[in-house]
Every structure is written in structure tokens, then in C-alpha cells.
């Protein structure tokens, strides 16, 4: 896998270093928190994850329960992103046929009632169970509990300097956008505004506020 960074030029990189110079204690505490929480969650939720994997394979045995995909992390560094499979195995190949139905402005593709989503996929998306495999990404250090959702390389290639600010921090399992009411009705610009807001406001208090609201979203089945 390529190790070169994507989407961060030298000028933006200098600004990033200045912006984060006073946050070393926060980063150390945040990483410690991520390791502890992800380790505990992997143990406690392992029966749920096993049941999810079995349900996916029973519903569609043509592929495995987890898929990996290259995403862009902090400082534009690519990493292998894991997610419980909620779509048919050839979902990427079918994307070109659906691009004209895209309901999201900007470089992100989203449509309601995506025909590539499987029966089990609809349930695990609504309950956010499809995200549980990313606990491994968090334990590895590719992701954090809280942070902007990791973007695809093709999306980052279209970022301007404003959108690149979301790459200053480690991508996360949940964020302001993830807990926003009717999040899929938000425009791409509104989504980026929420991510930049997090970059500027991030703190332990903000992180825990998002974590608690994420539990509420999952319990109420308000996931995608």
C-alpha cells in the first residue's frame, strides 16, 4: 500500500504544525483513551460482531463479512479501512452506473435506497453495526473514537484548502456529522463545516459529548 500522503501541500502542512503545537498533551491523552476504549469494546462486543458477520454471510455467501478499502487519514496518509459489508460484493463496479443519481453535492456519492445495499446491510447501517470492525482501525492508530469520517482518495483529490483542514486530525468512528439530525439531508458544504468546527473546537469535553450522543443515535437506530 502506498505510503505517500494525499491532499496536503507544504503551506497547509506548516499551518497544521503551528495549529497543533499546543495540543501534544491532548493527543497523548486521546490516544491512551482510544486504546483503552477500543480494546474494551472489542472484547465486550465480540459476540455482537460475530453475530453480525454470520448474518452477513448467511444473507449473501458470495463474499466475506468484512471488506477493506483505502481511505485517507491524518496528514493525508492512506490506510486500510475495515467495515462490515453492507453492500453486494461488486458495489464499486456498479458505482459508475449510479453516478447520475447522486443526491449529494461535492465529491461524495450518496443516494437514498442504494440498490447495492443488501437486506442485512440495511439493518446494520441503521443500527451502525457495520462500523464496529473499525474498532480494529482505532486500536491500530489509523483512526480515533472521535474525528471526521475517513474520506476516499478520489474525494480528497477534489478538496480545496478549507476541506483539507479535516485532514489535520485523525479520522474517527463518530463526529458532529455522524450525530447530526437528518445528517444525510445535509449538503457537502454543511458536512465540511461540521468537520472544520470539530477541528477547531476539539477537546476531551467535546469528544465525550459526541461519544454519548453517538450511543443515543445507535440505540434509536438513527444510523445511515
Residue ranges and their predicted role:
Residues 1-16, 64, 132-224:
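Hydrophobic structural segments characteristic of membrane proteins
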Residues 28, 46, 112-115, 130, ...:
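A generic structural signal for residues located within well-ordered alpha-helices
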Residues 124-134:
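Short acidic-aromatic low-complexity motifs
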Residues 26, 30, 117, 126:
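Active-site alpha-helix of zinc metalloproteases
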Residues 2-9, 66-115, 174-193:
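Short, glycine-rich, amphipathic interfacial segments at transmembrane boundaries or analogous
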Residues 17, 21-91, 209-224:
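A hydrophobic, helix-centered structural microdomain
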Amino acid at each position: 500500500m502506498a505510503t505517500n500522503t494525499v491532499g496536503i501541500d507544504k503551506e497547509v502542512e506548516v499551518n497544521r504544525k503551528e495549529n497543533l503545537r499546543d495540543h501534544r498533551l491532548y493527543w497523548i491523552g486521546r490516544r491512551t483513551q482510544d486504546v483503552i476504549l477500543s480494546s474494551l469494546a472489542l472484547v465486550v462486543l465480540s459476540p455482537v460482531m460475530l453475530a453480525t458477520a454470520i448474518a452477513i454471510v448467511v444473507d449473501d455467501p458470495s463474499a466475506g463479512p468484512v471488506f477493506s478499502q483505502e481511505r485517507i487519514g491524518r496528514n493525508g496518509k492512506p490506510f486500510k479501512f475495515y467495515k462490515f459489508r453492507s453492500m453486494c460484493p461488486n458495489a464499486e463496479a456498479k458505482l459508475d452506473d449510479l453516478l447520475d443519481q447522486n443526491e449529494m453535492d461535492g465529491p461524495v456519492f450518496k443516494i437514498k435506497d442504494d440498490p447495492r445495499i443488501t437486506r442485512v446491510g440495511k439493518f446494520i447501517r441503521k443500527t451502525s453495526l457495520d462500523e464496529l470492525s473499525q474498532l480494529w482501525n482505532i486500536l491500530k492508530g489509523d483512526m480515533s473514537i472521535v474525528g471526521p469520517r475517513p474520506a476516499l482518495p478520489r474525494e480528497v483529490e477534489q478538496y480545496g484548502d478549507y476541506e483539507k483542514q479535516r485532514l489535520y486530525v485523525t479520522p474517527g468512528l463518530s463526529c458532529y456529522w455522524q450525530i447530526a439530525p437528518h445528517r444525510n439531508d445535509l449538503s457537502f458544504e454543511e458536512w465540511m463545516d461540521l468537520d472544520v468546527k470539530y477541528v477547531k473546537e476539539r477537546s476531551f469535553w467535546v469528544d465525550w459529548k459526541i461519544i454519548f450522543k453517538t450511543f443515543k443515535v445507535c440505540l434509536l437506530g438513527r444510523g445511515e
